Amino acid sequence: LSEQLVINPDQPRLRLLLARLLFEAQAFSDARVQYQILHEIRPEDGEILFALAMLSIEQADFAQARLHLGRLVRTDQRVNQAQYYLGLVAEKTGDVALALREFAKVDGGYEYLSAQGRIVELISVNQSLEDARSYLAKKKLAHNGLRSQFDLIEGQLLSRVDAEDALFEHLDEAIEAQAGDIPLLYFRAMSGQKYDRLDILERDLKQVLTLDPDNADAMNALGYTLADQTDRYDEAYVLIEKALRLKPEEPAFIDSMGWVLYRLNRYEEAIDYLEQAFERFPNDEVAAHLGEVLWQSGKTRRAKRVWKEALS
C-alpha cells in the first residue's frame, strides 16, 4: 500500500485503508501521519477526526486530542463519544472539575454508562464514598430502566474500595428487587470468589446456569473454581468441557481445562492445553499453571523458561 501511495499519492481511499491497517497493527506514529494527511484533505470527516483524537490520546498529546474532539462536538459528529473522551482527557490531565462536566454531557449511547461510572469513581475519590452512592441513588430514581446497570456500577465501586459488608448487602438488596438479573448474579458470584465465599459463588453461578443453560462463562468460572479450590474434579471437568465446546478458542477456558486435567493427574494432556493457552494469552496466571505442571512432571528447565518469559 505504501508503494502504491508513492506512485499514486492522490488516492484518499487507499490512504485511509493504510491508516486503518497501521492503527490496527498499533503502529500509532505512522498511522497518525497518514490520518493527518487525510485530515488536510477532509478537515470535517468524523472518522478521521475521531481516529486522530484516539491516536493523540495514545501518544499523550492531550492538547491535540482536545482540538479534534472539540471539532467533532461542534460539527455534531459522534458527540457522545467525543464528550466521553473529553472527560477522559480532562481526567488524565488532573482537571477533575472539567472531567465531571464533560462526562455529565454524555446523554446517551454506549458511552453513557461508562461516563456515569467515571463520574462515580471521581466523586468517591475526590469527595467521599457516601457522596458517590448518593449520586447513584438519584440516578436510579431518575432512570428506573437502568437500575440494574447502576446497581452494577455501585457494586463495582464497593468492590474497588473493599467494602465487603456493604458490597454484599447492596447486591443482596439489588438481586432481591431484580430477581433473575444475570449480570448482578454473576457479579455477586465473582465477589464471592474475591472474598473466599465459595458458597456464594457456587449458588449464584448455578442460578445463572438455571436461567441461561448455555452460559459458557458461568460454566467455566464454576468449573475452574471447583478444580482449584475443592476436590470435586470430575464435576469441574464436565463443566469446563461443556464450556470449551461452546467457546473452543477462549484462552481462559483452555487454561481451565489444563488445570483440571492436572488435578486429575493427567499431566501430559494438561501440559498440551496449558501450552496452547500460554501461546494465545501469556499472562501470569497461565504461566504459573503451566510452570507448576511442568515442574511437577519433572520438566524443570521448561518450567523455568516459562516463568522467566512471563516475568519478562
Q: Each PLM stretch: what is its role?
A:
Residues 54, 190, 217, 221-279:
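Alpha-helical adaptor scaffolds
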Residues 7, 41, 74-75, 106-110, ...:
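Structural marker of alpha-solenoid helical repeat scaffolds
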Residues 2, 25-37, 59-71, 93-102, ...:
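Structural signature of tandem alpha-helical TPR/SEL1-like repeats
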Residues 107-111, 295, 300-312:
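TPR/TPR-like (Sel1-like) alpha-helical repeat modules
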Residues 14, 48, 82, 115-116, ...:
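TPR alpha-solenoid repeat register
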Residues 17, 51, 85, 118-119, ...:
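Canonical tetratricopeptide repeat
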Residues 11, 20, 45, 54, 79, 88, 112-113, 121, ...:
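Residue-level recognition of tetratricopeptide repeat
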